[in-house]
Every structure is written in structure tokens, then in C-alpha cells.
Amino acid sequence: MTTIDLSVKRRLQESVDEDKGKLIDLLSRLIRIPSDNPPGSTVEIAHFIKDYLEGWGFEPRLYEPNKGNVNVVASWGEGSPHLILNGHLDQFPAEVGEKWSVPPYSGEVKNGFVWGRGSGDMKGGLSSLIHCFCATSKQGLPGKLTLTCTSDEETGGRWGALWLLDNVPGITGDSVLSGEPSGGTVRIGEKGMIAFTVKTRGKPAHGSFAGYAGENAIMKMGRLLPEIEALRNITASLTPEEKVLTEELMKGYTAQFGHEAEGLAGVLTHVTVNIGIIRGGVKANIVPAECEVEVDMRVPIGVSPSQLKATLTERLRGIDLSASVDYSRHPSTILGATYSPPNSIITNVTRDNAKLVTGIEPFLSFTSGGTDCRFWRERGVPAVAYGPKVYAMGAADERVPVEDLASTAKVHMGMIVDFLTKKSK
């Protein structure tokens, strides 16, 4: 990196403190636009971001491949290197009856935090990406920077990141920076996801004849549930390199979750199975004709979705031939665990800048949740997440520390400069 590059980087990082009020205001304004998923409409927030970017002189493009699922794309520069900034617009809903200290869509700034639904997941990181995208555009940096604001990350990404990659030229890039909350770590990967519904069928009859007439679909389901739960016992097959990587990632997990990490550690290396919803029957005195359960399964490194799906089908058919399985999300959004090389350029510039800004060497980490990054990784593009700490994510009093929001923006500024200048040489 030249002296000029260092000067640009230092100036941009110092500007975060000068413009902290603008950064906080942008986050508050994003929070005040509900983008709950469900129902999933990002129309209003997408148009707000479009107007904001136009105020900086950009010509952002809106894409609405499915009604209400609006995505925003903007770019500056040209050629290579090409860095993609990625954040999602949708968020978990604020549930009726949640006990908030402030109105959930207020974006209130209080006690050193910006409060509100979506502040952490992920409007805090998104506001930093937007702010840095705009600020770095005026510095004469080489290469190209593209901002992607996607519509449906919370429900699988079919109409957001996946659709953009499949249909819009210039979205792939050389590497990806996501602003997802990462708890001070550099998140290089994530577990895979499989969501499915199992249904059993019986024969209705009057409840007074139970055991003598009809077939109870709920009882059939009861025999299947242990087999579904037992999928968590499938063991991962790891290469020596994957074993070393997993050990490193466990350190990052501890850094993220502190004292809770010991009890949660197995999440990274095992299949998890959550039987989250069960429905069956219409009345207590009628033998139920149908029963269904909705299941969320997360897949670690070393286990493939196809392996799990085949095992599930085999086990269910062995007990009840009438049982059916429906995979809730579009097949193209069901992927195994994905991760980026620990020594990729984007990983290294993230670690370097996080240490520069915070004074702490960040661990690499993995998430048990799902992000848009997986779609780029599946295409061989390194993708990492670095975003502000979040308290009570997805719950009452979700909030982001103001100082962490600012330090995240400084890291993002440095990453953009370093990636575009280092990769261009």
C-alpha cells in the first residue's frame, strides 16, 4: 500500500467520527421503516435507499422479481478488483405483546445505543455499508464497488441475493463483504439449512370409536418424531484441513458467546433438528385424519443436505408409507455448509482492519444461522461478514451500541480501501 493509499484510508476512518451523527441518523431512519418478513415487503425501504443514493449522485437500480420483494443495486468504478457489499432489507417482525423499553420502530438513540427492531439484524451493518459506499466513491480508488441491498434473506433469499446472481450482470464480483452482526469476529462461513414439513394421513371416525374405527394421524406422527429427531446423530465426515478449521472456528464461537459458548459449542459440529410446529385434528372427539410438523434443520461442515434428505425418506418410509415430506424452501436455496478460505484476501483485510480499529486480533467464526453470503460462496467467491455487536437480536429491546456502529464503519472503510488497492497490484 502506498503512502497515498494510507492517507486516503486514514482520512476515511477519521471521517467516521466527524460524520457519526449522520451514520446514526441513517440507521434510525432505516429502523423507522418497518420491513418485517413476514409479510416481506421491502418496497418502502428500498425506495428510501434509492432516494438516499440519488442524493449522492448515484443511479441505483431497483429489481422486483416477486411482488413486494424489491432489491437495490448501485455501483461506482469499473473493472477489477470488484468488491460486493451485501446487506438485507428484511427483518424479523416485532411480535404483539413484546415488552419493549422504547417503541420497536422508533430508532431511538438512548444510553449509548440505537434501539429498534432490525437494528442489529441487520440495519446497523447495512447503514455502515451504505455510508461507506458513498464516502469511498469520492476518493479516486481503483476497481469497482457494488452495493446490493436484498429483499428476503430471512426467508431463504430466493427473490433477493440468489435472484440477483442468476439474473443481473455484474453481481458476482471478486469478493463479498456482508454487514451481518459478527460479534467482533470475522465470520467466514455458515451451516447449511433445510426446512421441511412432514405429513401423516389417517382415517377420520367418531372419537367414541377410537381404537376400533379410523386411523389416528397424530399417533402415526408420534411414531415418526423420534426418527426425525434422530437425524441429529448423523456424524460429520471431516478432512484433516476441515478439522483444523473447525478447531479455529470454535475459538471464534467462544469469543462471540463468552460463557454461553461451552453449552452451545456442539452446534457448529453437529446436525441440529428443531421440530418447531405441529398441527393435527379438528376436534377432540374426532379421530384426526391429518397431522403435520414443520422442522428446521441446520447442517455442519462434512454433512450434505442430500445425505440427510435420503436418510429422512428411508426412515419415514420404514414406519409409515403414507407419510410425505415437503421441503418448504425453493430447492435452489437449500445448500450445505459454506465457508471462505481462511487466508483469502477479503478475510485478511478484514482481520487487519478489525485489529487496527479495535486493537484486538479478531477470531475467525462460523454462524449456525443462514446469510446471503452462501450464494456467493457456492459460486466460488470468497464472502465474509463483519458487523456491529447486537443485543437482544430478534427480541424485545434489540439494539446496537453507537460506538460499535462507528468502529464497524471504520473497519468497513479500511477494508474497502485495502481490498481495492491491494488486489489491483
Give residue spans per PLM region.
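Metal-dependent amide/peptide-bond hydrolase catalytic core
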Residues: 1-7, 35, 66, 195-425
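Acidic/His- and Gly-rich active-site-bordering loop/insert found
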Residues: 2-115, 138-142
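Structural motif
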Residues: 81-84, 113, 146, 174-176, ...
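Acidic/histidine-rich catalytic neighborhood of metal-dependent amide-processing enzymes
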Residues: 122-195, 265, 424
